[in-house]
Amino acid sequence: ECIKVLNVFEKGLSKSRNLALKNATQKLLVFTDDDVVFQQKFEKKIIKSFNSYPIHDGFRFQFLNSQGNLAKKYPRTFRSRLSKLEILNSSSVELVFKHESLTNAMIQFDENFGLGTEFFMGEEAIFVSDGIKKGLKIGFVPEQLVSHSQPSTGQKTAISAIYFVQSAVFYRIFGKMYLFWIALKLFFDLKFLHMVFYKHLQVCK
């Protein structure tokens, strides 16, 4: 296959992805990164998924961390649709879409979000959410496509900045309900910190 490289001077990950979408020519679009390793026969997993569920416009798959383990807690079985939590937990390296479906629904990445902008994350969740709101059928397939070792933005950024950006992401997706999702995130974050602190105390004893 031929590889097409596009050089631009604009800044912003979402702008780059939209440029790639505009210049894409194949029937299926795989969103990837420059530091992933594709698993053997990943393309067969993709084709099989779309052949098995032809009414779907896109799928969220799984990816592995550098240790070869699942990078996240995923559903164990196929899902014909994504829950709100699964939408929020989407990463670009998990996503594959039909080119025609994105074109017909006029779906693009929101260029106000993503690396290179003030709101430096959440563009994938917004992209998936916008697709569902416009009628695209997006499911989940429990198959691994890539391994990806790069730490997430959240692992390298201050907590206050993360909450600021995620508040904007939640508002963009859920509108007036965004406060509920902020409160829910805070609850689970505090619960996680409590568990870590408790384990630390047990070790110290």
Where are these regions (language model features)?
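Acidic donor-binding loop at a coil-to-helix junction in glycosyltransferase catalytic cores
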Residues: 114-127
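Glycine-rich, basic loop-to-helix element that forms the pyrophosphate-binding segment
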Residues: 8-24
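Non-catalytic, C-terminal membrane-associated alpha-helical segments of glycosyltransferases
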Residues: 157-205
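Conserved donor NDP-sugar-binding/catalytic core segment of glycosyltransferases
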Residues: 41-74
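Catalytic beta-strand/loop signature of glycosyltransferases that borders the donor
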Residues: 109-111, 135-147, 159-162
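Short aromatic/hydrophobic "clamp" motif used to bind/position activated sugar donors
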Residues: 29
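Short, flexible, basic/aromatic active-site loop/helix in glycosyltransferases
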Residues: 71-103
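Acidic donor-binding segment of Leloir-type glycosyltransferases
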Residues: 1-7, 48
